[in-house]
Structures are given as structure tokens and as C-alpha cells.
């Protein structure tokens, strides 16, 4: 417990500091009138013991400039990355729009993923949202929502995207014909995330990991349903 004298001393120190700051703000010419005294003021330094007020101010300025440079470099990196994402997405959209059939579109989508160094790209659709039954030949795209639900709960939870590995039974649900899948990027299709699933696969188990960016994946998951409606009717 602090003694009354200690509390009074802290109050006086706080008042003195405030009074000094207020005085300097109101009287900026103080530094001109007392330039020599200002040069003699020493400020505590963790390494050098003390430094002059001028050196201390210059060091703060250098640190501030360094932080600004780092922030600018980060903004430039983000701008370059966003530009790259934009052109990749634009190229994919143009390619898929030019498709002459659903099979052609799926092949173009798969080829686009291969050009990025991936094993491939796949689509699975929920049959309660798309007309996939006879007489159409799109039944291979159907994904039972009931079969997918345990995987969704385990891997996605409340999220729309999942990046990482899938075990054998999980792969049989979403990619029954896939081989040597190390990791996947999986996203729920549509703005309401209820139309199906888009999957990108890699043979590298560490290629897709939680915490990686999902902006491109998100944009593709929003773009695909409208393109699919050219070939498949919505329920």
C-alpha cells in the first residue's frame, strides 16, 4: 500500500510533466531561445546509456520512416498479388465462357488448374439444387448432400473454404476416382454456399494448408454457378 507522501509525489510529478508539456506547446520559441541548453539535454538509452535529445529525435524519425517503408512495401506486394489474382480469374472466366459444352467447360477448368501446377480441378453438385438426373448425362457430377454432410462438419464447420488433406473415406465421397491426392482446396459453391463443391487438388501434401489466402478460391466459387446454368437447369 502506498504511503500518502508517495501518492502526493506521483501527483506532483504528473502535474509537473503536464505543465512542462503544456508550456512547450504554447511556447515553441523556447527551443530557439534555449538552443544550447536543448543540445545538452540527455535522454536515457537502453544500449548507450544516454543520448542527446537531437539524437533521440532523429532515431525516432528513422524508425518512423522505416515503418512507413515496410508498410509501403507490404501494400505494393498486396497490390501485385491482387493484380495477379485478377488476371488469373479474368483468363479463367473468358476461357469457361467460350466453352461449347459442359464437358468442354469442365475440361477447360481442369486444364487451367493443371497450368497452375495442380493435379486438377473438379466440381460436385447437390442434386436438390440442380437437375442432374435422366435424361441428362450429368449424373456423374451429383454429390449426395447426406453423404457430404459429415465431411462438411468435420472439415469446414461454419467456414466456406477448407485447405488441407482429406483422408481416404473423405476422398471417396467427393473425388472417388482421384489418385495420389496430397491436399485439396475446397469451397462451397454459390453466395449461399449450398449449390455444391469446387475442389482443387495437389499431389503435394503440404501444398494446401490452413491459413493460406482464399480470395481466388472464393471468387471462383461465386463465378461458377452462373456459368454452369448455361448447361444445367437449377431446381
From Swiss-Prot:
Domain of life: Bacteria
Pfam families named in the record: DUF484 (PF04340)
InterPro entries, alphabetized: DUF484, GAF-like_dom_sf
PANTHER family linked: DUF484 DOMAIN-CONTAINING PROTEIN
Name of the molecule in the record: Uncharacterized protein YigA
Amino acid at each position: 500500500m502506498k504511503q500518502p507522501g508517495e501518492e502526493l509525489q506521483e501527483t506532483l510529478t504528473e502535474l509537473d510533466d503536464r505543465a512542462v508539456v503544456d508550456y512547450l506547446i504554447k511556447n515553441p520559441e523556447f527551443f530557439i531561445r534555449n538552443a544550447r541548453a536543448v543540445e545538452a539535454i540527455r535522454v536515457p538509452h537502453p544500449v548507450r546509456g544516454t543520448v542527446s535529445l537531437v539524437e533521440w529525435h532523429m532515431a525516432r524519425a528513422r524508425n518512423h520512416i522505416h515503418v512507413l517503408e515496410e508498410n509501403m512495401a507490404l501494400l505494393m506486394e498486396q497490390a501485385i498479388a491482387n493484380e495477379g489474382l485478377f488476371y488469373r480469374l479474368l483468363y479463367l472466366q473468358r476461357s469457361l465462357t467460350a466453352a461449347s459444352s459442359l464437358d468442354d467447360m469442365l475440361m477447360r477448368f481442369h486444364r487451367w488448374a493443371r497450368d497452375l501446377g495442380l493435379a486438377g480441378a473438379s466440381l460436385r453438385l447437390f442434386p436438390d439444387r440442380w437437375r442432374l438426373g435422366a435424361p441428362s448425362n450429368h449424373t456423374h457430377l451429383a454429390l449426395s448432400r447426406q453423404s457430404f454432410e459429415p465431411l462438411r462438419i468435420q472439415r469446414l464447420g461454419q467456414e466456406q473454404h477448407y485447405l488441407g488433406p482429406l483422408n481416404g473415406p473423405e476422398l471417396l465421397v467427393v473425388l472417388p476416382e482421384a489418385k495420389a491426392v496430397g491436399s485439396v482446396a475446397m469451397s462451397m459453391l454459390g453466395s449461399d454456399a449450398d449449390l455444391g463443391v469446387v475442389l482443387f487438388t495437389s499431389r503435394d501434401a503440404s501444398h494446401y494448408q490452413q491459413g493460406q489466402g482464399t480470395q481466388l478460391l472464393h471468387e471462383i466459387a461465386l463465378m461458377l454457378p452462373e456459368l454452369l446454368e448455361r448447361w444445367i437447369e437449377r431446381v
